[in-house]
């Protein structure tokens, strides 16, 4: 786990983006950046945001060699042929496209079912909120995993694959959504007959993802799957 300036590097790449329910926001660079943007848009916080940094907080200037390297990269980018044809993006196999299609179908039907129902979207204990939060994210992460795998097939590397990380996020969303639908049945908010198509989608998606991405479950997400390292980080900050 890499930490820079108190932030866990890459933690937001494989999270569920449900910041209101996350215990890692104080160590997330993306959360801090979004909070800063929102503060800039709030006139009540303008004076704080615009205040100059303290001398000890000001970052040191980049070394000369780094500035020269950046200048060279910018020059190369400007000199590149603007009309150069980009390689055609490879399409996933038909079987993988079927997973995308099923995720799309689940999203569409879950969205239609949720419409008109009142619930707090920020309450992670509310099964309605859980289904609402993950029905789109499952679709998005399935899409990312499937298309990332196409690009990774020709790469021989021991580095953890983005496709596995994205598939893991989708699988986590599937697991939580499955439990939420069953919770609604227990509460009497939906009948067994009504919930059956949604459960069938989730079971099919989960089994398909685990077949195509057998290493997804064991993918280690920065911070989120490293409790010992996070505990050490918190202890160091408190000490």
Can you annotate each of these PLM segments?
Residues 124-204:
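Conserved binding-pocket/active-site segment within a compact domain
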Residues 31, 73, 181-184:
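Generic structural signal for hydrophobic core residues of well-folded globular domains
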Residues 1-64:
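N-terminal cysteine/histidine-rich coordination modules
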Residues 63-161:
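Charged linear interaction tracts used for macromolecular binding and regulation
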Residues 179-239:
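Charge-dense, extended regions
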Residues 6-9, 13-16, 60, 97, ...:
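Short, solvent-exposed segments of well-ordered alpha helices
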């Amino acid at each position: 786990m890499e930490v820079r300036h108190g932030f866990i590097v890459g933690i937001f790449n494989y999270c569920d983006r449900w910041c209101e329910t996350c215990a890692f926001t104080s160590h997330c660079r993306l959360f801090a950046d979004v909070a800063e943007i929102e503060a800039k848009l709030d006139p009540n916080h303008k004076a704080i945001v615009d205040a100059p940094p303290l001398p000890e907080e000001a970052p040191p200037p980049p070394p000369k060699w780094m500035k020269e390297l950046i200048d060279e990269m910018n020059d190369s980018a400007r000199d590149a042929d603007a009309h150069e044809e980009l390689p055609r993006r490879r399409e996933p196999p038909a079987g993988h496209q079927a997973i995308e299609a099923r995720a799309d179908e689940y999203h569409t039907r879950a969205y239609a079912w949720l419409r008109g129902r009142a619930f707090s979207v920020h309450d992670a204990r509310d099964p309605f909120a859980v289904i609402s939060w993950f029905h789109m994210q499952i679709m998005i992460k399935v899409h990312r995993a499937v298309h990332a795998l196409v690009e990774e097939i020709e790469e021989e590397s021991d580095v953890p694959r983005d496709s596995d990380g994205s598939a893991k996020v989708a699988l986590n969303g599937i697991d939580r959504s499955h439990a939420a639908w069953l919770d609604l049945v227990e509460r009497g908010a939906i009948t067994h007959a009504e919930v059956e198509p949604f459960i069938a989608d989730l079971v099919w998606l989960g089994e398909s993802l685990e077949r195509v991405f057998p290493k997804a479950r064991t993918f280690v997400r920065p911070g989120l799957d490293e409790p010992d390292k996070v505990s050490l980080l918190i202890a160091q900050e408190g000490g």
